[in-house]
Amino acid sequence: MKNKMKAAAASIIFCIIFVFCFVKCVELLENKSARVQYEAFFESETNFDVIFLGTSHMYNTVLPQELWNEFGITSYNWGYSNCTTAENYYILQEVLKYTEPKLIVLDMYGLLAYENYGNGKYRTDRIEQQHVQFDSIPFSLNTYRASKDVFDDYSGNLDFMFNFIMYHNRWTELGEGDFTVTPSTQKGASFNVGLQQDAEFERLETDEKMEIDTVCYQYFLQILEYCSENEIQLLCVYLPYTASAKEQMVSNSIGEIIEAYDFCDYINLLYSDILNLKTDIYDSGHVNYLGASKVTSWLGDYVLENYNLSGHADEETYSGQWNTEYEEYVQYKMRTISAEKELYNKLLLIYGDEFEADLKILDGCNAEKEDEILSELIAELSDSISVEYVEELSLEDKKYDILLTIKRGNEIFDVVGYEYQNTQTIEYSY
């Protein structure tokens, strides 16, 4: 009898150790992007008043930490690269299990973009991107339905329920980031650093529309019905970027559709005057940090004015956690600024009320006059930058044409010199 009890106990202990080791192996081998992006959502001690959903347009444009700093709004950005409306239909239902937002904001880009990929519900050539969001969500009946529906033509759709199937052979890919995971400080968002020169936007008339009949459009209608039936406030938004003619026609066609649904509204920001095409564009589909900050500020004003929201900056239950995490975000921005080499990128990153810059230009240097982008950036930063012309400039015994000093309060954390060259193109060397 004792031997049987010992054998049973040994079996139980073995099973416990095996399960523990298996779980740890699963955690080690999984792609850590999901934890980096969404761990802060699941571990938050406070509610989120606003949830943002959508594609990379939302992911790169709306910055929750800036919303907190300016308005005291608590929000999380669940947008991600190539996240389709079909995926958002299921992600929305999962997110609502963990927080009780007063408003859902849905990015409208993508109603046409994915129609020529497989079943039209996801990017067949971006499976790894689709995993980032679904890997973060605990298994449920809803995720099972999503894997069988959205990825119905993908032979490995079980990966989206049990991601160990996909990642079990990552042993050779493991790096330092797999052993120490640092969650993003951006509350799901990710701002772009860079500037597209000569960006153009050929605006259509708002009455130029088109019929939308795509797979993702059908899921968009399901989202409208879901929010309307459950009395969830939904704001659909077409975020600003240099859209094509067809994309503009889609943006012009959405409003009439949404009017038929209670609790659902629509704003089209493609034709707003929020962006400066000379300073705010990252590429043909996205804005940079400067553009994102402007759009975020505009949306903050809009939702406070039009929805039942108020700031939490003076509430202890919110301010402790959010102020601490905002400071971590600012420190991340400071590291990003210091690591950046390009003059334009440093300047666009100091937009806002956190940083100040002193820009010294050597007498006789015509950079401000000859470089339209530089002069536009200086104008955009008028509240936080001072420009001074001096007779001599040097840094560490090297002479420069331009010297940029960036500080936060009284702390100078970045100083860099540039030589200005204007031949056929304008260039800055450092």
Model-based region annotation:
Residues 53, 57-142:
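Membrane-embedded segments
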Residues 6-26:
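Hydrophobic membrane-insertion alpha-helices, especially the h-region
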Residues 249-326, 330:
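C-terminal regions of proteins
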Residues 331-430:
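Short acidic-hydrophobic catalytic motif
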Residues 27-47:
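Alpha-helical transmembrane signal-anchor/signal-peptide segments
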Residues 190-257, 261, 266-274:
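Flexible, glycine-rich surface segments
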Residues 47-49, 72-74, 100-103, 228-235, ...:
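Loop/turn elements at helix/coil->beta-strand transitions in domains of secreted/extracellular proteins
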Residues 121-229, 312-333:
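Secreted/periplasmic serine-hydrolase-like ester/acetyl group-modifying domain
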